[in-house]
């Protein structure tokens, strides 16, 4: 029978309804129909599911380790469970209740884990499947769980409670035993006070029948399980935090709240054998040391060849104010105090054997910190730490923005790795990472993926995210180009931010050319080139831009002289720029107002730039009339054009980073010219601003920079040329510059006059309902809110090669600008020829007059060719700029060609294109060059879109959106037919809005917590293959052999004493537990899950084989019995027949 597919029916319905609505929404005449494009994406290509979670577990609370499987488990205060094996093997699970995890216990080498939560629930997890699941849960109803202990190779779990009682749970059935240790029976009968909650439970390593119970008040009890009474009671004045056994079972050690350690002989309960205050000051006259901070945990580990290790956390003296948390390692007479960067949550000592009654031979200590995981090598002098292979440093500085790139050039990851490998710290342990359990998944994904994170300290990190793993590749520190403030009085002018003046807000990256551009919170932009060579930059290239919406009448020292629009360093002086040519940061107007001053001060000393990303140009917005610059809201870079553009709520600026010149510096209103649909006017005269048309096109004196500013970063350190030749060259360049300047001004004025005559297209009405913009806002987390139409911010920028006007017959380079009021404006770019002329002739920038309108702030723009394929922005392939090349080869590489993935290159396109525009409220597909609205889709009415991306999937493209109401939606292109609409995650904080992003091949991610990245997929194919891609946590490993008891110990009973716990705790001897004490909750696995927890795949196969043999044997026995019965039946039939023949002719009276 054929399976009924409801989604195909929905496809048909949505296709029919959308086509009907699209016919109504099309704004062009019926006779001018758009050519049909065959769309291949259907709803069955989409499915939403989480893939993996990377990063450090947020708010960790518990730690456990399986010494045989070599798997580490971390629980958190939010109920999350993170499991780590070998590098690349990670797993994330979540308790539905969200209660804090207070303790974790592995069933060692069984592929199972017990978690105890703060809501007094115990859960049994099956780790023998790629996605662990809960098999059983046990909810305690009348008592609070405080401590759990599961002996090695035992199925009985001891559970201590706040009331001081101990209950016993069978981990196979997850039911309570009737055996209970009551607190009033454990303590002295004469004692009148309650001993407090149970803080420790452990069995004697040499006698499983003896249970050591630690109570918070300071009482320790050795309980005999068989006789059900206390053998010994140990009392100390200070509260107990933890207890640990010596492996011989004759001594144990306790840590106390006054910073002391007490060592007790099992048979001497009167007083401790030894009292140690590790960090206490030893006073004279034998007095007791001053009390210290509590020792929260202690471990006692022995070695065959030397003194035992005593490892503890806490216990520092109270006078060490401000000292960082410490882990103390005491070995023999030496004491090492290891300082940690964060508070210690828990620690575990990794030992060679899982058996508690053998020499432990510790080799490492895992320390779980509040924001880090540290592994200390105990076998090497100095106790170095292991280099952590997990991606746990995402939060090293808080993440402020995030970008995700799938299907990158194949040479990118090796290139980034090679330069990042040189940044690694020295001094790590030489041993391999000891947590190496599990196996990698067999992923079918082979395309490279890169995640870029921007951070609050100004750093940018590149991560290899291929095949659902994460590994740091390279770290860039953008703050290196700025002067650091040494004291509060010398702080830079970062009044627009309280702290983190270097924080990254926006990242624009071209993977093909490897050009990187970042925008920071202090209204600064830095452009980087990638190089494999180390260079020394004598002077950091720098531009200052005066970007202002409105200028009040402010008196300046120059009187009526207006300040220049851009402030390039060095002006037009052809001579090399000395370091002091950087603008002074103390500039101010005559009435004390800060003016023409950037927020940060660029270094004026030579800068050594290591291989990797090297500074090409620093651009800063300056203070104007006492007002700080507004933070940047949008950013775009294009390597083919050599341009970078950025905008904020004041306006837009475009910079030629090859010539180090400002090409465009306009307020947002001036972009409209006479076509402003809101009819806005500046509220005061603008003395320092030129008319809008001229301001857009005019190239000022300051925009042409000396040749030295156009050189590569190595120019400053290159050998000087002959002075006569240099003078001639400078004179020649000045002549060329003067001519090109005059020509550019003439062209600019002509274009400006033309641009003013261009009106708004008649088919796009400017009187759209502005009230729909109530949700419009900047995507930046700290940008000033836009509450008036006059504060229209630039929200999206896109370089492309397309039709700028209706009358265009061929595409040309241009910039599309989107604003927060839903307007799209098009700016034409006239680029000079490539090669040396590109460095000498100016780029002409002019408005096209094209204005398009949507509801809500513009988020994303892209372009399709006539076949529906995505037209990517033009780019220049990467090349090494710091290596001299042959002239003809250099000319060849200097030519910038736009590259397209469509069948026909963009130079040959004569047919129409489609512009895809996504705003906070709707999406439109505009046909070019006619500028008719081909398709329109209202994405949301009651919410707004936080992120929209045009992405490739299954050899096609679609629009993917994430809304503030938690819905993830996808639409086909170009018809904007709905394909997916799933409620996933509501917007709970700005962190999600700031970091959520889609990329190609159905991948997406966001920052789920301050320390973790959550990746998800909306591709059906990836969801189906996810099981294969995930790693396996459990691998069949033989349990190590138990330690040899030795001849004499076996003869005289000195070895470990075993205990038949089944007989002691089973229902037959101890009875049933009270039903009101705890409630059993079966997990999704049910009875089959129990089998899975007890055995797993290998065990099940063995059992199945055994069952098959038994079944075969039984079948054989049955066959034999059947044959015997058949033979007996035949014999009986034969005898009956003989008797019948014998008496057949006889009469009845003859018998």
Curated annotation (Swiss-Prot):
InterPro entries, A to Z: Lethal2_giant, Lgl_C_dom, LLGL2, V_SNARE_CC, WD40/YVTN_repeat-like_dom_sf, WD40_repeat_dom_sf, WD40_rpt
GO CC terms of this entry: acetylcholine-gated channel complex; cytoplasm; cytosol; extrinsic component of neuronal dense core vesicle membrane; hippocampal mossy fiber to CA3 synapse; plasma membrane; SNARE complex; synaptic vesicle
Biased composition (Basic and acidic residues): 881-892
Subcellular compartments: Cytoplasm; Cell membrane; Cytoplasmic vesicle membrane; Cytoplasmic vesicle, Secretory vesicle, Synaptic vesicle
Domain of life of the native organism: Eukaryota
Pfam families assigned to the protein according to its UniProt record, in alphabetical order: Lgl_C (PF08596), LLGL (PF08366), WD40 (PF00400)
Cysteine pairs bridged by disulfides in the record: none
Phosphoserine sites (modified residues): 692, 723, 759, 782, 785, 900, 902, 1058, 1131
WD repeat residue intervals: 61-94, 101-140, 145-181, 200-234, 240-272, 294-336, 344-378, 400-477, 505-619, 633-695, 794-851, 860-934, 939-983, 997-1020
SMART domains in the record: WD40
Alphabetized Gene3D superfamilies for the sequence: 1.20.5.110, YVTN repeat-like/Quinoprotein amine dehydrogenase (2.130.10.10)
Subunit structure: Interacts with STX1A and STX1B via its v-SNARE homology domain. Part of a complex that contains STX1, STXBP5, SNAP25 and SYT1. Part of a complex that contains STXBP5, STX4A and SNAP23.
Chain's role: Plays a regulatory role in calcium-dependent exocytosis and neurotransmitter release. Inhibits membrane fusion between transport vesicles and the plasma membrane. May modulate the assembly of trans-SNARE complexes between transport vesicles and the plasma membrane. Inhibits translocation of GLUT4 from intracellular vesicles to the plasma membrane. Competes with STXBP1 for STX1 binding.
Protein's recorded name: Syntaxin-binding protein 5
UniProt source species: Homo sapiens
């Amino acid at each position: 029978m054929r399976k009924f597919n409801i989604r195909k029916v929905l496809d048909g319905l949505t296709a029919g309804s959308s086509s009907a609505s699209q016919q109504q929404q099309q704004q062009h005449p019926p006779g001018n129909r758009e050519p049909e494009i065959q769309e291949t994406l259907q709803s069955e290509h989409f499915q939403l599911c989480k893939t993996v979670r990377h990063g450090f577990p947020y708010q960790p609370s518990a730690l456990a380790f399986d010494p045989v499987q070599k798997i580490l488990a971390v629980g958190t205060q939010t109920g999350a469970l993170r499991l780590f094996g070998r590098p690349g093997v990670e797993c994330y699970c979540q308790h539905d209740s969200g209660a804090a995890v207070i303790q974790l216990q592995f069933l060692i080498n069984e592929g199972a884990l017990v978690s105890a939560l703060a809501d007094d629930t115990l859960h049994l997890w099956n780790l023998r499947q790629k996605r662990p699941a809960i098999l059983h849960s046990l909810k305690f109803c009348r008592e609070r769980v405080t401590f759990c202990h599961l002996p090695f190779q035992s199925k009985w779990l001891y559970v201590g409670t706040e009331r001081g009682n101990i209950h016993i749970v069978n981990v196979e059935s997850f039911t309570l035993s009737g055996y209970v240790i009551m607190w009033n029976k454990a303590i002295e009968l004469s004692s009148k006070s309650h001993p407090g909650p149970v803080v420790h439970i452990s069995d004697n390593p040499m006698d499983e029948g003896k249970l050591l119970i630690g109570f918070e008040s300071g009482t320790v009890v050795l309980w005999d399980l068989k006789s059900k009474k206390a053998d010994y009671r140990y009392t100390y004045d200070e509260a107990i935090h933890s207890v640990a056994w010596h492996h011989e079972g004759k001594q144990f050690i306790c840590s106390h709240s006054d910073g002391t350690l007490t060592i007790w002989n099992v048979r001497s309960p009167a007083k401790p054998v030894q009292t140690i205050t590790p960090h206490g000051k030893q006073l004279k006259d034998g007095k007791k040391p001053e009390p210290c901070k509590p020792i929260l945990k202690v471990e006692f580990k022995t070695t065959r060849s030397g003194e035992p290790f005593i490892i503890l956390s806490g216990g520092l003296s109270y006078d060490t104010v401000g000292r960082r948390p410490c882990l103390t390692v005491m070995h023999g007479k030496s004491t090492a105090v290891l300082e940690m960067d964060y508070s210690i949550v828990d620690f575990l000592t990794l030992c060679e054997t899982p058996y508690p009654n053998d020499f432990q031979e510790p080799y490492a200590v895992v320390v779980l910190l509040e924001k880090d995981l540290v592994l200390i090598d105990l076998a090497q002098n100095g106790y170095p730490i292991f280099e952590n292979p997990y991606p746990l440093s995402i939060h090293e500085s808080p993440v402020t923005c995030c970008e995700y790139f799938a299907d990158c050039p194949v040479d990118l990851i090796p290139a980034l790795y090679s330069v990042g490998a040189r940044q690694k710290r020295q001094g790590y342990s030489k041993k391999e990472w000891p947590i190496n359990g599990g196996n990698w998944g067999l992923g079918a994904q082979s395309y490279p993926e890169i995640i870029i994170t921007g951070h609050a300290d100004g750093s940018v990190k590149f991560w290899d995210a291929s095949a659902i793993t994460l590994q740091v590749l390279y770290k860039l520190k953008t703050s290196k180009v700025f002067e650091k403030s040494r004291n509060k009085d010398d702080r830079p002018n970062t009044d627009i931010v309280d702290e983190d003046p270097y924080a990254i807000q926006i990242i624009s990256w071209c993977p093909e050319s490897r050009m990187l551009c970042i925008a920071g919170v202090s209204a600064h932009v830095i452009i980087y080139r990638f190089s494999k060579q180390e260079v020394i930059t004598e002077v950091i290239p720098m531009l200052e831009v005066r970007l202002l919406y409105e200028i009040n009448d402010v008196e300046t020292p120059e009187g009526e002289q207006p300040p220049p629009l851009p402030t390039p360093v060095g002006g037009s002086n052809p001579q090399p720029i000395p370091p002091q040519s950087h603008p002074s940061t103390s500039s101010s107007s005559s009435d004390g107002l800060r003016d023409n001053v950037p927020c940060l001060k660029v270094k004026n000393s030579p800068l050594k730039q290591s291989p990797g990303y090297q500074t090409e140009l620093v651009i800063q917005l300056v203070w104007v009339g006492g007002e700080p610059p507004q933070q940047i809201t949008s950013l775009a870079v294009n390597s083919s054009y050599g341009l970078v553009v950025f905008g904020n709520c004041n306006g837009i600026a475009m910079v030629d980073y090859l010539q180090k010149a400002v090409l465009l510096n306009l307020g947002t209103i001036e972009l409209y010219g006479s076509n402003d649909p809101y009819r806005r006017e500046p509220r005061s005269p603008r003395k320092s601003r030129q008319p809008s048309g001229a301001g857009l096109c005019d190239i000022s004196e300051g925009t042409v920079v000396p040749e030295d500013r156009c050189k590569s970063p190595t120019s400053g350190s290159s050998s000087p040329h002959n002075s006569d030749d240099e003078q001639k060259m400078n004179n020649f360049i000045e002549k060329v510059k003067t001519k090109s300047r005059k020509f550019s001004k003439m062209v600019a004025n002509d274009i400006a006059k033309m641009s003013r005559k261009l009106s708004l297209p008649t088919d796009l009405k400017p009187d759209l309902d502005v009230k729909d913009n109530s949700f419009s806002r900047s995507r930046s987390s700290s940008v000033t809110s836009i509450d008036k139409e006059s504060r229209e911010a630039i929200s999206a920028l896109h370089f492309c090669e397309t039709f700028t006007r209706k009358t265009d017959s061929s595409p040309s380079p241009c910039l599309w600008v989107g604003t927060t009021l839903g307007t799209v404006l098009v700016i034409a770019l006239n680029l000079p020829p490539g090669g040396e002329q590109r460095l000498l002739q100016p780029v002409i920038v002019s408005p096209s007059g094209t204005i398009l309108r949507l509801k809500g702030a513009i988020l994303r723009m892209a372009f399709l060719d006539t076949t529906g394929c995505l037209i990517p922005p033009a780019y220049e392939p990467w090349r090494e700029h710091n290596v001299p090349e042959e002239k003809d080869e250099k000319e060849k590489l200097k030519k910038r060609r736009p590259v397209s993935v469509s069948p026909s290159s963009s130079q040959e396109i004569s047919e129409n294109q489609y512009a895809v525009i996504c705003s906070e409220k709707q999406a439109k597909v505009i046909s070019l060059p006619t500028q008719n609205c081909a398709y329109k889709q209202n994405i949301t009415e009651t919410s707004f879109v936080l992120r929209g991306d045009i992405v490739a999937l299954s050899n096609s493209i679609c629009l993917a959106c994430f809304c503030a109401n938690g819905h993830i939606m996808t639409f086909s292109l170009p018809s904007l037919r709905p394909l997916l609409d799933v409620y996933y995650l509501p917007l709970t904080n700005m962190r999600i809005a700031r970091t959520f992003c889609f990329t190609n091949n159905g991948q997406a991610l966001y920052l789920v917590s301050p320390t973790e990245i959550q990746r998800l997929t909306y591709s059906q194919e990836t969801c189906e293959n996810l099981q294969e891609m995930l790693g396996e946590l459990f691998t069949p490993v033989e349990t190590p052999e138990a330690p040899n008891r030795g001849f004499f110990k076996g003869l005289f009973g000195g070895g470990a004493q075993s205990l038949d716990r089944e007989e002691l705790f089973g229902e037959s001897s101890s009875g049933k537990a009270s039903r009101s004490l705890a409630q059993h909750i079966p997990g999704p696995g049910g009875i089959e899950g129990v089998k899975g927890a007890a055995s797993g795949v290998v065990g099940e196969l063995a059992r199945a084989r055994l069952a098959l043999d038994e079944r075969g044997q039984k079948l054989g026995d049955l066959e034999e019995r059947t044959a015997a019965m058949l033979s007996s039946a035949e014999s009986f039939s034969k005898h009956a027949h003989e008797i019948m023949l014998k008496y057949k002719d006889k009469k009845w009276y003859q018998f």
